[in-house]
Amino acid sequence: MKKERTFFLNLLGEGKDTIEKKAGETIVNIGQPGEHTYLLKSGTARIDLIGGKHTVELGPGDLIGLMGSIDGRDYEDTTVAITDCQLIPIDQKRAEYLFREHPTFAFHVIKVLIDRFYFAMDLAKRYRQAGVAI
């Protein structure tokens, strides 16, 4: 398990405000207002990218809808539960508290954002090389 996943679970895994999603249920939907980031406490989920042309599987410790609690923008993709999932919601107020009181939280979020940036760049490069419009 990546160090960031373990860190997030250790910091937030005992959250009392757990949300349950059954397999097949949508966790966040593209275009929906981004009010929360969700920590995937248990289960697996799938992000549908580029209109479902590409998917990414997520597991315990992964963050879903990361920008939701940072700037409140609409979700950029749809995430669906593959198996039954437990999620811990992080709203903007809680995110601000975590950034302020747990600087290591901010460091790990930045690492996740960097990983996702490089993943997106690599995916775009592969699509361009294949002559596929995205």
Model-derived segments and their meaning:
Residues 1-134:
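Cytosolic regulatory regions built on CNB/CRP/Popeye-like sensor folds
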